[in-house]
């Protein structure tokens, strides 16, 4: 028996004691951050996202369509890619009726129109699954209706976010969205601002690897007013 085999044989014969699973979620519950109110939490989230050039519009369930249209028109967009297999995609298309912005359905296989997609599409529109306050983040799920390319390729990304699904931290989002129990989607991505990169000279550039503009339509609950949030937000 070689020295290697002798060592391995001793290891296999040794008593193996199972290690106790660490209480990861209990640790984060105890050590995690919190805020005194929903307003303070939203202000923190907004400040973190705006610090990296994210545009945030505080909207309601009844007026987000109008704000979306005005923001899109303000950017001089010629077209916008919509997930028409979703309810919010259908509503967004209706919001653009009689405008100069052409709504385009995301319904073709990417290989059949790759050149057009990468060169002629001005903006994309999607929904967000939830938000993470501490880091100023949106969590999005990729799906056949809203693939990752919808929010990654166009130079402008509009994202509809229901702020009632705001979590304090990442682990709260994992628990709240039941990602362990229900299983992870094929692709989960965290967005904290438009695409940005810096070279060795620390020159910051936006849009190199994704959208140069991120526009969030943040739907507020009835008991919170946009005026409450814009003070020092």
Curated annotation (Swiss-Prot):
InterPro entries on file: FTHF_cligase-like_sf, LUD_dom, NagB/RpiA_transferase-like
Gene3D superfamilies: NagB/RpiA/CoA transferase-like
Top-level taxon of the source organism: Bacteria
Chain coiled-coil ranges: none
A Pfam family hit: LUD_dom
Note: Present in outer membrane vesicle formulations which are used as vaccines in human.
Family under the similarity heading: Belongs to the LutC/YkgG family.
Protein name: Uncharacterized protein NMB1437
Organism: Neisseria meningitidis serogroup B (strain ATCC BAA-335 / MC58)
Lineage: Bacteria, Pseudomonadati, Pseudomonadota, Betaproteobacteria, Neisseriales
């Amino acid at each position: 028996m070689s020295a290697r085999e002798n060592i391995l044989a001793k290891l296999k014969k040794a008593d193996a004691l199972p290690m106790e699973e660490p209480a990861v979620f209990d640790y984060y519950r105890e050590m995690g951050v919190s805020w005194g109110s929903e307003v303070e939490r939203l202000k923190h989230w907004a400040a973190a996202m705006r610090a990296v050039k994210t545009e945030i519009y505080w909207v309601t369930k009844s007026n987000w369509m109008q704000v979306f249209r005005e923001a899109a028109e303000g950017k001089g967009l010629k077209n916008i890619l919509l997930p028409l297999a979703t309810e919010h995609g259908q509503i967004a298309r209706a919001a653009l009726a009689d405008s100069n912005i052409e709504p385009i359905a995301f319904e073709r296989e990417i290989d059949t129109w790759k050149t057009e997609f990468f060169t002629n599409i001005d903006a994309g529109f999607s929904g967000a699954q939830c938000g993470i306050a501490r880091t100023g983040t949106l969590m999005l799920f990729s799906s056949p209706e809203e693939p990752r390319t919808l929010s990654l390729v166009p130079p402008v990304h509009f994202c509809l976010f229901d702020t009632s699904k705001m979590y304090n931290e990442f682990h709260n989002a994992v628990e709240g969205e039941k990602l362990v129990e229900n299983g992870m989607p094929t692709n989960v991505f965290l967005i904290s601002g438009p695409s940005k990169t810096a070279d060795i000279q620390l020159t910051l550039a936006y849009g190199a690897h994704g959208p140069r503009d991120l526009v969030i339509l943040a739907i507020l609950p009835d008991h919170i007013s946009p005026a409450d949030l814009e003070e020092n937000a």
